[in-house]
Amino acid sequence: MKKSDLIIVRGAGDLATGTIHRLKKSGFHLLVLETDHPAAIRRQVALSEAVYSGSTCVENVEAVRIESVEQMRQVWEEGKVPVLVDPKGESIRLLKPKVVVDAILAKKNLGTTKDMAPLTIGLGPGFCAGEDVDVVIETKRGHNLGRIIRQGSAYPNTGIPGIIGGYGAERVIHAPAAGRMKNRSKIGDIVEAGQVLAVIEGEDGSTEVSATIDGLLRGLIRDDYPVTKGFKIADIDPRKEELANCFTISDKARCIAGSVLEGICEAVE
């Protein structure tokens, strides 16, 4: 492949954004595919926000929502990244990209197959390298984070977040009830354990969402987003002094991005 060839990235959450950012800065032509209602938590560093706002910028890379593939080249000419609502990846067959990166991070394969492109890359569990994709990238924190897997799968999803500042599961908040989020806090706020971060308005009334630990509110799902019970809705960083982390791509995302870039560069002529 050549640098001018099309790469399609499925998903634009915070981890996917790390990959999109790296590939854009490396000079590749990208098209990003998203759902019509992305559920990113770390919204300040998720290019998926362009679906709602029309455009968004993360670390000097701007993403712009497009309504059809015909608008893609114009966005490229402006030096930006086009984002198309296409959750099923129907545009992939039409555009015939050289690379498809599944960065949805759904912990399962939502439909990416090896025949979509000459090179297919899946991030995290749910893919088997050599079967449904060519390459899998490990996304679990630890010694193997970012490892390129050419045969087999990434570690299965444990449901236990990686440790940050001595906290794991405690730093991630899930919806205690179903309903619509009514946020009382914003990303970047210093919060205390027990503090009400949001209220979920459901059919059976209102349910408060409280901070689980003291720290920095690093992620919070969009206001008015409809959630189901158990849905991931917030993320607290116990390192209160790390405000910049709320607005910059994480070490984990950058590590994964480097591995994706390596996998693609091996195929560049």
How does the language model describe each region?
Residues M1-E269:
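Well-ordered secondary-structure scaffolds
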